[in-house]
Amino acid sequence: MNILISNIGRRGYLVDFLKADRCFDGKVFVSDCDETASGLYGAADQYFVLSRPVDNPEIYIDNLLSLCEKKRVDIVIPVIDPEIPILAKAKERFAEKGIMVLVSNQEVVEICNSKKMMNRFLIENGFELIQTYDTIESFEEARAKSKIDFPVFIKEDFGSASLGAGVVKSMEELRFRFNDGMIIQENVQGEEYGVDIFNDWQLKPVRIVIKKKPAMRSGETDKAITVYDDSILYLSIRLGKTLKHFGPLDCDILKKGEQMFIIDLNPRFGGGYPASHLAGANLLGLLSKLKLNQPIEIDYKAYRDGVLTMKDIGLKSVKVHHA
């Protein structure tokens, strides 16, 4: 079974994980829109430079599908946010050719991509939510009623990599930094956890891995420690059953005492996946069963707890052609 990881960026470790799996006997291809992406130059069988998906989605999909047919790719794994909605819309085109694209349906992707839509989904399904406001006016009204006060936390509705997010300590600063594409939230202090929730082809959770996140870098997990936590496990099972995503979901949960808040959803393998994999949860190894609609046994503790994973700075040098 051949796999293509699209827009791999710096996530060459995904190739290494696949190649190290004794049960995997196919080829691994990688692509990116940047020929200097480090993930192109590693253990992959072949790499390809394609156009940026957002520049012209139709041309990108045509070229990607043509490449997959030529190389007999069985599974496409996207790993960056901007590409996910584009592939979700084109998922059936690939399926007609026998190619599984590892993305959820468009509705799930839209919920995950927009903080406002995510919050609406959480409220409608009875999940606990951090106090959130879409406008300065609604925030001021709540503040006047002593429901919330500074400091607050602002973030982009469609933000990625924590761009624009941060703590705001005064109304003057809020008016300066806030724009219509943002939300304002209570600045809840608690422990942050990253959770990998893997659903099978029937859209039911079969694997869950919980990690404490002591360090982040540019919105991505830099250090993580695997843990067992029943309260987070039950919340994650409920989320997986309710959201009904397909395959991997990278979820961030903030825990304050007995309260637990879902603060971010990414319908893909996230930056914290290496911590899950290196602790024994080989979610990549489940993809062949997912592709063939085969049953996957439920195991919510298919990993070792207390495993600390840290990202290091690796170096590569390759010969390039220049004008």
Which residues are covered by each model-predicted region?
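Short loop/helix-cap segments at secondary-structure boundaries that form the rim of catalytic
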Residues: 36-44, 145-147, 175-178
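Short, hydrophobic beta-strand segments that form beta-sheet elements in well-ordered domains
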Residues: 5, 27-32, 133, 152-153, ...
